Curated annotation (Swiss-Prot):
Presence of the UniProt keyword DNA-binding in the record: no
Key word Membrane present: yes
Highest rank taxon of the organism: Eukaryota
Gene from which this protein is expressed: SCEL
Record field: compositional bias (Pro residues): 186-195
Region of interest (16 X approximate tandem repeats), residue spans: 251-563
Species the sequence originates in: Homo sapiens
Gene3D superfamilies, per database record: Cysteine Rich Protein
Renumbered ranges of Sequence repeats: 251-266, 267-286, 287-306, 307-326, 327-346, 347-366, 367-386, 387-406, 407-426, 427-446, 447-465, 466-484, 485-504, 505-523, 524-543, 544-563
Domain LIM zinc-binding: 619-685
Protein's UniProt name: Sciellin
Segments traversing the membrane: none
InterPro entries: Cell_Prolif/Cornif_Regul, Znf_LIM
Length: 688
């Protein structure tokens, strides 16, 4: 017993001695760190020798001696020593033992300290086991149990030892004993009770596995799977979904549908469908409007119940609605084989088609408008039960009177080749207009406006309530027998098809390469403007209809071999020739009502002389818009002016500046070219 008592007392003294040494070392290290920090802050480590102070780049040279990963606050010999960092354990003696393991004396002290501490802890375990297993047992039995447990824990000691860095020579497995000393803090306070005096290593390993808390990885995966299940229920897939249009009781507009197949249900506006094959649903009982479709083969609704608008198709094979009960507006179709609506009970608007073989519809019981066709093989309507009148007008300013339920006036036509109309029982007139100024046709029951017709060859209507006008090289068309309100828009280079069997008012607006119109019916229909067009406002009300022409002053659309038209807001100079025209390439944006894109004339634009040769803006005169060729030219890049020398003039007094020689002066003031007299006048205003 005395031997055991000495064992318990001796480690206490060594423990206190080692603790004092560890505390002293920590204080010394702390002071050294402070010294090094101050050493770096005052840059004294750079100025080592007087000769080094003379070199202004010495600090940079010193820094280049070190690698980027080196710690500058340590000594060179300390940098090369690998340090083992263990974040799992934080006791003072363990850190001191690992950091100072090169010192044999300190290592020996740490080993003796750990061995004595281990003996003390084992004596504590032994006393616990004595009280539990053999309360009345002898010391020899306790000793045997202690030896058995020590030998039994040897496999665990090897297992724990693998967690540490490899020990240096002379290191007597103190790290594993240190870890066993800390096991009561990690494990439950009472060690597991062995089932036999000598327990097997497998049983101890099994107990260790049971004592250790569960791994955090399993818990994390369980939480992640639970979160994934919860989130997967609240996540909606909104990508790559085919959209369908909603139904509403009032007008809706759908803009810019590209490469899509859409269907419209009620009161919807479909704007500018590009490269699409749309099918519009039928069964509409109220007014519909079909808007311009571009590069499309469109089929419009049948038996519609609400208002629909389908944009005007360009280069389209178009079929319009049949058996409609509401009003419809069909805008002009360019390069289209159009088929118009049949047997509609209320007012409809049908637009002209360009380069189309039209078919005329017969047996109409209501008011209809047929527009003139340009370059068209028209078919005229026959079997007319109402009065018709045939007027031949040659180079005449005629006025045609129509005896319908509402009187109509057809105003001045100038230089006209008339088309004849036959078998008329009542007043109907078909007007052929060539090189005509515009006119407005208004009926008493419903006012009608007839837009300007330019360069038109008319065709006659035969034996039908509807007039079919054939126009060759024509902008305009004539308005025909209608009991109510009708508007007929200008058509240029169009072969339209006209649809009959309407019981109510119909509006047929042909808008091809034209200033297009926006048609608004009694049931609020919107007809969108066509691209490459100047819009004219077309409004259908119960009383009066106004068809406004927004063409340029000459009411003239310049023709291009490539089919391009001049749609600029204003021209920079005189009217373009037929050979060279300015073309504005517009983006494929959805056209809005009254939409017109203003493009500045200073950008490089493409113009076409022939179909196979393009000329850029620099090859064209800025003022006269003719090719520059090999003549003398004036180029001012800052003002983006490139013109003939004969066209170069003072923009104030219009004095030609073509005879300028070396040394002559021109003045540019506020982006405007001034000759010397004009600029001197401006200079005089500055001087008081």
């Amino acid at each position: 017993m005395s031997n055991v008592t000495l064992r318990k007392m001796s480690p206490t003294g060594n423990e206190m001695k080692s603790t004092t040494q560890g505390t002293t070392r920590k204080q010394q290290d702390f002071h050294e760190v402070n010294k090094r920090r101050t050493f770096l802050q005052d840059n004294s480590w750079i100025k080592k020798r007087p000769e080094e102070e003379k070199d202004e780049n010495y600090g940079r040279v010193v820094l280049n001696r070190h690698n980027s990963h080196d710690a500058l606050d340590r000594k060179v010999n300390e940098r090369d020593v690998p340090k083992a960092t263990i974040s799992r354990y934080s006791s003072d003696d363990t850190l001191d033992r690992i950091s100072d393991r090169n010192d044999a004396a300190k290592t020996y002290k740490a080993n003796t300290l750990d061995n004595q501490l281990t003996n003390r802890s084992m004596s504590m375990f032994r006393s616990l086991e004595v009280t539990k297993l053999q309360p009345g047992g002898s010391l020899n039995a306790n000793t045997s149990n202690t030896i058995a447990s020590t030998s039994a824990t040897t496999p665990v000691k090897k297992k724990r030892q693998s967690w540490f860095p490899p020990p240096p020579p002379g290191y007597n497995a103190s790290s594993s004993t240190g870890t066993r000393r800390r096991e009561p803090g990690v494990h439950p306070p009472i060690p597991p009770k062995p089932s036999s005096p000598v327990s097997s290593p497998n049983q101890l390993r099994q107990d260790n596995r049971q004592i250790h808390p569960p791994k955090p990885g399993v818990y994390t995966e369980t939480n992640r799977s639970a979160e994934r299940n919860i989130r997967s229920q609240d996540l909606d897939n909104i990508v790559k979904v085919a959209t369908s249009l909603q139904r509403s009781d009032k007008g809706e507009e759908l803009d810019n549908l590209i490469k899509m197949n859409k269907s419209l249900n009620r009161n919807q506006g479909l704007d500018s469908l590009f490269r699409a094959n749309p099918k519009v649903e039928e069964r509409e009982k109220r007014a519909k409007s079909l808007e311009s479709l571009i590069y499309m083969s469109t089929r419009t609704d049948k038996d519609g119940k609400g208002i629909q608008s389908l944009g005007s198709p360009i280069k389209v094979n178009q079929r319009t609605d049949k058996n409609e009960k509401g009003r419809q507006n069909l805008e002009s179709v360019a390069k289209v084989n159009a088929r118009m609506n049949k047997t509609s009970r209320r007012s409809e608007d049908l637009d002209n088609a360009t380069e189309v073989n039209p078919k005329g519809h017969e047996n109409t019981t209501g008011k209809k408008d047929l527009d003139g066709l340009i370059k068209v093989d028209p078919e005229t309507n026959k079997n007319i039960t109402r009065g018709q009148s045939l007027d031949n007008l040659i180079k005449v300013t005629p006025e045609v009177k129509r005896s319908n339920q509402g009187s109509k006036d057809l105003n001045n036509f100038i230089k006209v080749y008339p088309g004849t109309e036959k078998s008329t029982e009542g007043g109907q007139s078909l007007d052929s207009l060539i090189k005509v100024t515009p006119e407005r046709n208004r009926t008493n029951q419903g006012n009608q406006d007839l837009e300007n017709l330019i360069k038109v060859i008319p065709s006659a209507n035969k034996s039908s309530e509807q007039g079919l006008d054939e126009h060759i090289n024509v902008s305009p068309k004539a308005v025909k027998n209608t009991d109510g309100k009708q508007d007929l828009d200008k058509l240029i280079k169009v072969n339209p098809e006209i649809f009959t069997n309407n019981q109510r008012n119909q509006d047929l607006a042909n808008l091809i390469k034209v200033n297009p119109a926006v048609i608004r019916n009694n049931q609020s229909q919107d007809l969108d403007n066509l691209i490459k067009v100047k819009p004219s406002a077309l409004r259908n009300t119960n009383r009066d209809q106004n068809l406004e022409n927004l063409i340029e002053v000459n009411s003239h659309v310049s023709e291009n071999k490539n089919g391009s038209s001049n749609t600029g807001a204003k021209q920079a100079g005189p009217q373009d020739t037929v050979v060279y025209t300015r073309t504005y390439v517009e983006n494929s944006k959805s056209p809005k009502d009254g939409y017109q894109e203003n493009i500045s004339g200073k950008y490089i634009q493409t113009v076409y002389s022939t179909s196979d040769r393009s000329v850029i803006e620099r090859d064209m005169c800025t003022y006269c818009r003719k090719p520059l060729g090999v003549e003398t030219k004036m180029i001012l890049d800052e003002l983006q002016i490139c013109c003939h020398s004969t066209c170069f003039k003072c923009e104030i007094c219009k004095q030609p500046l073509e005879n300028l020689q070396a040394g002559d002066s021109i003045w540019i003031y506020r982006q405007t070219i001034h000759c010397e007299p004009c600029y001197s006048k401006i200079m005089a205003k500055w001087i008081p």
